[in-house]
Amino acid sequence: MRALCLLCWAVLLNLVRACPEPCDCGEKYGFQIADCAYRDLEGVPPGFPANVTTLSLSANRLPGLPEGAFREVPLLQSLWLAHNEIRSVAIGALAPLSHLKSLDLSHNLLSEFAWSDLHNLSALQLLKMDSNELAFIPRDAFSSLSALRSLQLNHNRLHALAEGTFAPLTALSHLQINDNPFDCTCGIVWFKTWALASAVSIPEQDNIACTTPHVLKGIPLGRLPPLPCSAPSVQLSYQPSQDGAELRPGFVLALHCDVDGQPVPQLHWHIHTPGGTVEIASPNVGTDGRALPGALATSGQPRFQAFANGSLLIPDFGKLEEGTYSCLATNELGSAESSVNVALATPGEGGEDAVGHKFHGKAVEGKGCYTVDNEVQPSGPEDNVVIIYLSRAGPPEAAIAADGRPAQQFSGILLLGQSLLVLSFFYF
């Protein structure tokens, strides 16, 4: 019994033990307060009572918040850190404070912030991050803050906002976001629409204005004129050649990704083959098929050649190049993707007999199937598989090399769902 009493006393003493020497601690209005403001501190002092619910470290010289900075005070409900020199907040610095309702980081030098820590602060009602150097907010930064009522982001360096950033803030009643250098391109149009329709109080709307482009500088977002904006769209087609490229002799598979959207989307190719996945930021070659500076290639011509016009060439197509070919277009308004599965077979593996039984040629201008002059595009879910059948033909009399040598012809059939594409290539 005596041991139990001693243990209880030890716990009580821990809860009410003195504050760190520079700070004052006490109870006020039912809250356990630790006041360390204006103490010229350069770090969070250790030794706080575990029952502290309000901690003020405002007006000090804190340069940053390390991981576990507030591990001693897990019951904190209010944390005041304004007017310091905080440049960064490490991941894990704030995450343990699951009871936090008010967080003030205003008037610092914040350029890096542990946005993921906010996911654990679901009780937060007030978040002040104004007067910092923040240039970017992740789309999911506030995804767990359904109780947040007031958010202050004014006087930062924000130039863009990801669409849907404020959608999780269902309790939000006050948003201050003025005096940021917004880039008034298509990516900001959603915020104008949201702000005009929202019941959230947004003060100083005349100071929520464009900084770029120059022609729109100073115009408030609420009076932003209509912009020619559209989300990306893609159409993947299959062609036996592309404009202006110098092709090597041999069989070449050519795909073309027709991209539309405003602003002009960025095009990427995602290629999944038996040997692994290849990611290509288009273009990676010039019009001569040679690798551009900075493109990864072990020789003058990469295995997969992505051209600026949206074409993708695969020289010497073979079994190792079988797989799924996807083109992905992305701009500020979203992304779009189209894919095709490509498989290579020989006539001995089904050949023309399989063609006749499984697929039917589509007549085009009296022809029984598509020719090299026709571009084929998938018309439905069944048209997303390309099977290439190769055969060798004798040298045609009309195909003669510059030095008089006859050319060898390689013929092929591309099966595109319900369509056929007959290809002929000449090897000199």
UniProtKB/Swiss-Prot annotation:
Tissue: Detected in thyroid, heart, retina and spinal cord.
Matching SUPFAM superfamilies: Immunoglobulin, L domain-like
Domain of life of the organism encoding this protein: Eukaryota
Primary localisation category: secreted
Pfam families (alphabetical): LRR_8 (PF13855)
PANTHER family according to UniProt: IG(IMMUNOGLOBULIN) AND LRR(LEUCINE RICH REPEAT) DOMAINS (PTHR24366), IMMUNOGLOBULIN SUPERFAMILY CONTAINING LEUCINE-RICH REPEAT PROTEIN (PTHR24366:SF14)
Protein name: Immunoglobulin superfamily containing leucine-rich repeat protein
Organism name: Mus musculus (Mouse)
